[in-house]
């Protein structure tokens, strides 16, 4: 999914007031911290040690080198000793990437029997980090602050979470969204200022005529289509529901052809997310369903009915969770209908076709069923129920004067009974702290009916991204 192996620079602040021996210790301690962080196995990206920063010029130079290194996704700063914060102003003013302030110290415990003023001067992060933190706050620079000993797994976990957010921020500046169709007519929340999105978020949002992309679909060879259909038949349960087997396979093959054609178009033109709309399908024989689900599982973002904002968020949230151990999945989602029985409240989540199978719990089936919208033949889709457990639903909306990111923690549950007549993938969740409060707050905030949903991210991470 990612085209580069991102790294994070570790910048240690000090000053020349304490002498060469002290500065040698500072450098040695910083190297030990970096080596141990990398060996811990708890961080998703490599930390790179940089020489101790003690002058205005070197600080400014290092921050600009970080700006210009495409593999650097952010910097971690730490003041081992006192480091006069005015020395950091020029560098911080010009820095353009995510920033984490690690408020730690080399030693975990005060050496009660041997501590003297040399030790105090050398190990005064409690002093130096406050000086540095003050200037960052005064300059109005957004950053993450993580406090605690660097060897503590809880501290490492918070660094790891921030790293994923930082990569989301950096990748956001390169996201390219393909609009296969315009927004659904008369729908408000899927609209938005695409120019402002490029200015504020870095997103490129381009539209192409549906039939230009349909030409790529039509150009897919029969051999390639058959090979992908065979893969589907090996991976998923085939749920004929009384349909003729040959006719069923032909419908599935249409989706295979769409998957291959769409992906070739997106790879050729370097797009990372895609939107479709059932009201504008051109020469496509079916509304893309199974095809979109498969593309989402590969890491592409998706939004229904032209919802490019949600498509970009799904892409970014997939990037942020890439390589995560025991990941449970990320998907495009839509609020559909409520269960309002006291004690059993929740929202049944689904969409017409395009929920990502990364969130599936148990077997995944292929169905071909009629779709009342789109005026095309019956589309094939993957059907499943989602995993249980905590997650987040995120909605980026355009309020006219600014964008707003709305995040709700949710608790995914199993539905009480099977739903044999519902031919789509589903999730069922209760918003935190409860359905009534969550729904009221969501509506007051202007949240959309579409969301980018993930089991693997937190509200804190998405708030940091925003």
Labelled PLM ranges:
Residues 2-25, 174-183:
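Short beta-strand segments enriched in small/hydrophobic residues
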Residues 24-40:
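Short catalytic helix/loop segments, enriched in acidic residues and glycine
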Residues 44-45, 103, 108-243:
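Cap/lid and interdomain-hinge subdomains that line or gate substrate/regulatory clefts
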Residues 51-65, 155-157:
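Structural motif
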Residues 59-72, 89-91, 259-268:
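Short, well-structured alpha-helical segments in soluble
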Residues 72-82, 100-102, 271-276:
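Periplasmic-binding protein-like
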Residues 231, 235-323:
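Long, internal scaffold/assembly segments composed of regular secondary structure
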Residues 375-466:
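Extended hydrophobic packing segments that form well-structured cores
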């Amino acid at each position: 999914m990612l085209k580069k192996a991102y790294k994070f620079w570790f910048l240690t602040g000090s000053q020349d007031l304490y002498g060469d021996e002290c500065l040698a210790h500072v450098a040695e301690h910083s190297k030990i911290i970096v080596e141990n962080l990398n060996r811990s196995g708890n961080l998703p990206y490599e930390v790179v040690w940089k020489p101790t920063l003690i002058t205005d010029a070197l600080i400014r130079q290092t921050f600009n080198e970080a700006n210009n290194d495409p593999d650097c996704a952010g910097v971690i700063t730490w003041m081992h000793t006192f480091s006069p914060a005015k020395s950091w102003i020029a560098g911080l003013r010009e820095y353009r990437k995510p920033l984490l302030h690690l408020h730690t110290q080399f030693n975990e415990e005060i050496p009660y029997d041997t501590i003297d003023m040399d030790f105090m001067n050398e190990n005064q992060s409690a002093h130096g980090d406050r000086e540095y933190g003050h200037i960052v706050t005064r300059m109005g620079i957004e950053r993450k602050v993580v406090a605690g000993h660097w060897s503590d797994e809880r501290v490492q976990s918070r660094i790891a979470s921030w790293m994923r957010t930082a990569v989301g921020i950096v990748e956001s500046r390169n996201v390219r969204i393909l609009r296969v169709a315009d927004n659904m007519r008369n729908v408000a929340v899927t609209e938005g200022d695409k120019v402002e999105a490029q200015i504020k978020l870095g997103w490129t949002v381009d539209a192409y005529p549906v039939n230009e992309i349909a030409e790529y679909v039509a150009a897919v060879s029969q051999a390639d289509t058959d090979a992908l259909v065979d893969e589907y038949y090996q991976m998923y349960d085939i749920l004929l529901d009384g349909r003729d087997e040959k006719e069923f396979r032909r419908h599935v093959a249409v989706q295979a052809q769409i998957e291959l054609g769409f992906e070739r178009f997106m790879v050729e033109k370097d797009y990372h997310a895609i939107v479709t709309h059932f009201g504008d399908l051109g020469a496509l024989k079916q509304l893309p369903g199974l095809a979109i689900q498969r593309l989402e599982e590969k890491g592409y973002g998706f939004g229904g009915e032209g919802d490019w904002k949600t498509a970009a968020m799904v892409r970014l949230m997939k990037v942020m969770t890439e390589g995560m151990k025991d990941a449970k999945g990320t998907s495009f989602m839509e609020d559909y209908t409520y269960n309002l029985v006291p004690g059993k409240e929740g929202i049944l989540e689904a969409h017409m076709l395009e929920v990502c199978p990364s969130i599936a719990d148990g077997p995944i089936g292929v169905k071909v069923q009629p779709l009342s919208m789109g005026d095309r033949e019956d589309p094939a889709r993957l059907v499943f129920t989602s995993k249980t457990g905590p997650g987040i639903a995120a909605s980026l909306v355009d309020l006219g004067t600014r964008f707003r990111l709305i995040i709700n923690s949710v608790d995914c549950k199993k539905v009480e009974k099977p739903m044999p007549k519902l031919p789509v993938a589903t999730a069922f969740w209760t918003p935190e702290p409860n359905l009534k409060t969550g729904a009221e707050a969501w509506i007051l905030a202007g949240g959309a009916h579409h969301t980018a949903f993930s089991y693997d991210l937190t509200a804190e991470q998405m708030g940091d991204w925003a």
